[in-house]
Amino acid sequence: MTISPPERGEKAKGGVPTPYDQPVDRGNAPVDFEKLNKPGFWSSKLSKGPKTTTWIWNLHADAHDFDTHLGDLEETSRKIFSAHFGHLAVVFIWMSAAFFHGARFSNYTGWLADPTNVKPGAQVVWPVVGQEILNADLGGNYHGLQITSGIFQMWRAWGITSEVQLMALAIGAVVMAALMLHGGIYHYHKAAPKLEWFQKIEPMIQHHQIALIGLGSIAWAGHLIHIGAPVSALLDAIDAGNPLVVDGVSIASASDVTNLAPKLCDPAIASQIFPSLAGRTVENFFTLNWWAFTDILTNKGGLNPVTGSLWMTDISHHHLAFGVFAIFGGHMWRNAVHGVGHSMKEIMDVHKGDPILFPAPKGHEGIFDFLSNSWHGQLSINLAMVGSASIVVAHHMYALPPYPYIAIDYPTVLGLFTHHMWIGGLFICGAAAHAGIAMIRDYDPAIHVDNVLDRMLKARDAIISHLNWVCMWLGFHSFGLYIHNDVMRALGRPQDMFSDTGIQLQPFLAQWVQNLQQSAVGTGQLVGAGNLPGNVLSEVFNGNVIEVGGKVAIGPIPLGTADLMIHHVHAFTIHVTLLILLKGVLYSRSSRLIPDKAQLGFRFPCDGPGRGGTCQVSSWDHVFLGLFWMYNSLSVVIFHFSWKMQSDVWGLTGGNFAQSSITINGWLRDFLWAQSSQVLTSYGQPISMYGLMFLGAHFVWAFSLMFLFSGRGYWQELFESIVWAHNKLKVAPTIQPRALSITQGRAVGVAHFLLGGIATTWAFFHARLIGLG
């Protein structure tokens, strides 16, 4: 059955376009506060007010679904564009709050003076109801809450050395928030862009790639070169016990650096720290004498032994190079100003693909038009890419720590890894959600015939059935290895276990990659002509242990049987998540069970009475189920990371990962139970808030099960009996109580499941590492 997408307003029907002389409409929509007094003003049904309690849930569910409010792509685009400015304003206010707390309440300068012994603290808890116990002794005569965001380490890398500078940033961020709010109002109510402006893809890419990313990265490189790196060099020298002398004055403290900071843009001063800043930088640049910059734009590699972080001059070099690449890449596209360059539509239309491996005769024809008319399609791709990038960042943050002293702040390292993993997982689930919406609302089967998208849909049974086979294979085999080990250990037969001392299952490919990286040192194998210095590679590749302040910043990460086993659990959970999410997209419009699924929309509970077994098959329900498996996947990842680092790198659990993590019982006993002692015994200590959070989050998680285990009918019957009792007492409400719909109940359930699970893990991790000191 062919089901076309709904019409989306005059601008989306593909008729004769209006002349594109001005990119905006002036005086588009005057500000109207009256309609805001009527909740649900965008819907004729909701705007009538509540008759049942379902009204408030529909209000929440549909508030941001601009597609259904308007049915017009131009107006939807304008609202989204305006909302972006509002979002940026919120981000700037949040940043301002962080800067303000740092300036007014924190121990930033105390930490800066002794970063290996003083712990970061954001604020002091006021003893309103006697909760001053939460103020821990963080060193340097400061009692307050210990923070684990890495913000102090980041500020030091920026070159911030005083509370005055933080307060200036706080004020600046508020000003930027005001500008963003004004921008949002202006670009919707005063000068609203036309649909054609939003659909000019090449200029949009150029603006983002050249102006925002390219020039932004180079501008940041400029800050690092002139402020960040010199300040870091001065502070590093102080921490190493060999303060630098600038203009005849020994720079022996952070306050000395603060006093010197305004002079760092003076070449005579800056060149005493980095000679290449001596004032002939422009001449050297334009005469191609770039070797003059090798002290400020370096390729040292490895970590700074004083701070346990990447060299600031390496980071400056990275941002400069990245910005140049982005600018070159952005100029690849053709725009209205000059007719030179590539057209993305032309590239995609002629790109056919492999006729044997992927037989789609029309290749990518129609894909450009689909994406330039489907913001859900674009958002899906962007969410998948940014989510994947967040997961990449999570793994780089500990292997190549970018900020000074962050590597020895173990709660922060674990917190940032966990944070970036959760963000990545949620974004990837969001990618599946918006891909499903795009397929239902924006996809026209009559246009997509024999192209790659059509080919994917035709091959969906093969794709999903193969994924299903892979998931079963991985699940049975990975879990089977653990069950075998539990049985053998229970029977007292360690020699028959899969382990490094029994039946070995060594990850030889991963070990080969590690050895390849390490053996490439000095051979030029990885960098072409030049030889590779010994410290270019991360220390995790069979490198050296780097200690800072008596704590391990980074060291080699050995891999063995335990890692191979948990790796296959990772593969299993990730493939199941992919199976669920991909099935939701590929079967979003139709299936053998429900051929007319596209007409039912993105979310629907069941396909009407008399058609049994058709509940929970909507694209929305696949995202719902995918979120649980995403949670499973990432729980295994962050537990693996936490235990592995404590055992094999930080030296906190005596290297017990290799022998304990190869059984289910080992995970329960030596990880969950043994490491939860800090959170369970936290009462009466500054970490007691994590004990309360641990219990409260468990309650939130358990609360979710009430929504996930019970059916709607159960609750409706219960409500009707309660309403009957109210009627008998003549106190019946005017708004009729209704049980949540199946979809609403599942949404509340998964939200509390994830919130409870994440907050429980948060309390468990932080209490563990903060409690150990």
From Swiss-Prot:
EC id: 1.97.1.12
Binding site for [4Fe-4S] cluster: C606, C615
GO annotation (BP), single: photosynthesis
Example of a GO MF term: oxidoreductase activity
Subcellular location(s) of the protein: Cellular thylakoid membrane
Disulfide linkage: none
Entry's Gene Ontology cellular component terms: photosystem I; plasma membrane-derived thylakoid membrane
Entries under Pfam families matching the protein: PsaA_PsaB
Record field: transmembrane: 80-103, 166-189, 205-229, 315-333, 375-398, 414-440, 462-484, 564-582, 622-643, 687-709, 747-767
CC cofactor note: PSI electron transfer chain: 5 divinyl chlorophyll a, 1 divinyl chlorophyll a', 2 phylloquinones and 3 4Fe-4S clusters. PSI core antenna: 90 divinyl chlorophyll a, 22 carotenoids, 3 phospholipids and 1 galactolipid. P700 is a divinyl chlorophyll a/divinyl chlorophyll a' dimer, A0 is one or more divinyl chlorophyll a, A1 is one or both phylloquinones and FX is a shared 4Fe-4S iron-sulfur center.
PROSITE patterns reported for this sequence: PHOTOSYSTEM_I_PSAAB
Family: Belongs to the PsaA/PsaB family.
Function noted in UniProt: PsaA and PsaB bind P700, the primary electron donor of photosystem I (PSI), as well as the electron acceptors A0, A1 and FX. PSI is a plastocyanin/cytochrome c6-ferredoxin oxidoreductase, converting photonic excitation into a charge separation, which transfers an electron from the donor P700 chlorophyll pair to the spectroscopically characterized acceptors A0, A1, FX, FA and FB in turn. Oxidized P700 is reduced on the lumenal side of the thylakoid membrane by plastocyanin or cytochrome c6.
Name of the protein: Photosystem I P700 chlorophyll a apoprotein A1
UniProt source species: Prochlorococcus marinus (strain MIT 9211)
